[in-house]
C-alpha cells in the first residue's frame, strides 16, 4: 500500500538469501526488482557477479541493456528497436547508457550448473549450522559467549553463514576475537556492514539520519559475528576442531 500510494519502486537486496521464504513466498519476489550475489562464499557461487530478478519483459530488457553498455543486442524487442533506428548499424546499436557487467562464459556456466543443487545446498548448510550450534552448547566450556539468530514459523531460512551476536561481556574485545579466529584458521567477518550510516561512503550525502537513531543496527554493528557454512556435510572431526578454535578465541 505504501509503495503504490507513493509510487515507489522497491528493489530487494536479497544478496545472501537465495531460496529463503517468508510466509511461503520467496525472498526476492516481493519487490519490483531483487538482487542476489554469487560471490564465492554464497549458496551459489560463480566466484563474482550475481543475479537480478524482475517481473516483466520491459524491465528485463532494460536490465540486459544496462549490463551490456546500453546495447540493444539480445533484447526481446531487438527487431523493433532496429526498425526504429535503421540508419545505425544494427550490430552496434546503443539505446541507453550502461555498464560492462556481463559475466564471462565460464562464470555463467559455473553458476548455472549449481541451480539444480540449490535445495541440497540449503539443506546441507542448515545441517552444518545445527551441528555446530549443538557441539558448542553441549560443551562444558559453553558459557553463553554468543547468542544465535533463530527463525519463527513464518520464515524458511537459507543460511548464508553462521550468524552470532557476542555476549555484552565481549563487546570491547570483538576485534581480538576476530583476529584470534583468523590466526587459528576460521575465516570470519562482521554481520555485513553493520550500521551502514557509520560507513564513510555516506558522508558525502549529508543525510539527516544519524547512526545513533538506529539502536538495533548499532547493536548488530557492535556485537555481530559471521563464520562460513560449507555446501557439504561437516565431519565430527571438523565440528570438534571448530569448537576448540571457538573456545580458544573467546578465551580473552
Regions found by a protein language model. Name each.
Residues 1, 21, 57-252:
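PLP-dependent aminotransferase class I/II
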Residues 1-9, 19-22:
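Active-site core of PLP-dependent enzymes with the aminotransferase class I/II
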Residues 8, 32, 223-225:
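Short, well-ordered coil/turn segments that N-cap beta-strands
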Residues 8, 48-49, 118-119:
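Short active-site oxyanion
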Residues 10-12, 190:
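Hydrophobic residues in well-ordered beta-strands that form the structural core
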Residues 12-45, 61, 90-95:
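Conserved active-site segment immediately N-terminal to the catalytic lysine
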Residues 45-50, 109-111:
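Adenylate-forming
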Amino acid at each position: 500500500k505504501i509503495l503504490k500510494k507513493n509510487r515507489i519502486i522497491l528493489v530487494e537486496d536479497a544478496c545472501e538469501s537465495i531460496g529463503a521464504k517468508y510466509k511461503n513466498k520467496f525472498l526476492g519476489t516481493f519487490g519490483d526488482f531483487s538482487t542476489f550475489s554469487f560471490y564465492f562464499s554464497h549458496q551459489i557461487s560463480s566466484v563474482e557477479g550475481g543475479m537480478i530478478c524482475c517481473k516483466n519483459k520491459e524491465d528485463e530488457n532494460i536490465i540486459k541493456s544496462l549490463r551490456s553498455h546500453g546495447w540493444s543486442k539480445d533484447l526481446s524487442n531487438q527487431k523493433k528497436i532496429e526498425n526504429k533506428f535503421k540508419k545505425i548499424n544494427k550490430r552496434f546499436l546503443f539505446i541507453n547508457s550502461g555498464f560492462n557487467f556481463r559475466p564471462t562464459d565460464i562464470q555463467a556456466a559455473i553458476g548455472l550448473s549449481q541451480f539444480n543443487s540449490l535445495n541440497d545446498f540449503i539443506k546441507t548448510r542448515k545441517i552444518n549450522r545445527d551441528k555446530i550450534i549443538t557441539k558448542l552448547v553441549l560443551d562444558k566450556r559453553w558459557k553463553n559467549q554468543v547468542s544465535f539468530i533463530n527463525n519463527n514459523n513464518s520464515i524458511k531460512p537459507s543460511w548464508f553463514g553462521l550468524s552470532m551476536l557476542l555476549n555484552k561481556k565481549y563487546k570491547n574485545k570483538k576485534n581480538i576475537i576476530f583476529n584470534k579466529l583468523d590466526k587459528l584458521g576460521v575465516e570470519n567477518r562482521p554481520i555485513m556492514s553493520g550500521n551502514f550510516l557509520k560507513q564513510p561512503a555516506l558522508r558525502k550525502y549529508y543525510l539527516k539520519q544519524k547512526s545513533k537513531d538506529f539502536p538495533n543496527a548499532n547493536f548488530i554493528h557492535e556485537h555481530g559475528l559471521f563464520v562460513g557454512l560449507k555446501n557439504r556435510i561437516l565431519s565430527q572431526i571438523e565440528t570438534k576442531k571448530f569448537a576448540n578454535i571457538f573456545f580458544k578465541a573467546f578465551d580473552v
